[in-house]
């Protein structure tokens, strides 16, 4: 059975050019230097397997560099996570300096209370979601598009009711342009090391584990986005809100939230063209899905009408033959 997909033209010409990294944090009016108190990789690739430990703070195929720094953050304040295509990308040297516009999906943030943010491994239990934005059903607009239009600034409000102390702050986005095939969703995340002060400590959030919070077949992970969607279920638990009943259940998103920053970036109009793809079966990767790369454990045989094309040591993709 064939699935009719609408593939953005921009994706056809730049399918390998638009990974991304959370590489700076702004707090209390201070924009810290690249990689300051953030475990950043030098390579901007994704994590595709949600069952690995690397889904917490990156690593594995994208080795991260430890940081001995911690950023002070006031509970109840808003911090800004800054995303860039690479650690060196700027508007002057990179046309897709945040993320390629074809990489559509949700944007989220999590926190984890730790004893020492500089040494905690990140993976395991203790994570709670504090913000999310997915699909605006009315406009069919995605959170990643808003992130690009906001110059890569993800605004995150730190809950005022949590306990003081050190935390890992996990900023994440998921690119769903290849999510119709097994392990096709591309997860991008880094962890910042922060120290929270001014919190009331009146609430203890319910938590989830990374890995564990996401499943490879979750409806927000395995999905064909090239259709009109009436709903989209953002992966993971519902965000923690001070004073609200707590739950770790997933919920459908019809998000209309916008970033709080007023920074904007003009983007060109995306032209769509019709195409078709074969749904992936056992051992077969769909057209436009990943088919290889360092650490890749999914299908390496492409669906009929496509071939596996190597773009780097870390990423290969099924493209029309």
Curated annotation (Swiss-Prot):
Disulfide bonds join 57-191, 161-242. It catalyses: [(1->4)-beta-D-glucosyl]n+m + reduced acceptor + O2 = 4-dehydro-beta-D-glucosyl-[(1->4)-beta-D-glucosyl]n-1 + [(1->4)-beta-D-glucosyl]m + acceptor + H2O. It is found in: Secreted. The gene is AA9C. Pfam families: AA9 (PF03443), CBM_1 (PF00734). The keyword RNA-binding does not apply. SMART domains: fCBD (SM00236). Keywords: Carbohydrate metabolism, Cellulose degradation, Copper, Disulfide bond, Glycoprotein, Metal-binding, Monooxygenase, Oxidoreductase, Polysaccharide degradation, Secreted, Signal. The keyword Disulfide bond applies. Belongs to the polysaccharide monooxygenase AA9 family. Major lytic polysaccharide monooxygenase (LPMO) that depolymerizes crystalline and amorphous polysaccharides via the oxidation of scissile alpha- or beta-(1-4)-glycosidic bonds, yielding C1 and C4 oxidation products. Catalysis by LPMOs requires the reduction of the active-site copper from Cu(II) to Cu(I) by a reducing agent and H(2)O(2) or O(2) as a cosubstrate. Residues 1-18 form the signal peptide. CDD domains: LPMO_AA9. PANTHER family: ENDOGLUCANASE II, PUTATIVE (AFU_ORTHOLOGUE AFUA_1G12560)-RELATED. O2 binds at residues 177, 186. It comes from Botryotinia fuckeliana (strain B05.10) (Noble rot fungus). GO terms for molecular function: cellulose binding; metal ion binding; monooxygenase activity. It comes from the Eukaryota. Its EC number is 1.14.99.56. This is AA9 family lytic polysaccharide monooxygenase C. It is an enzyme of class 1 (oxidoreductase).
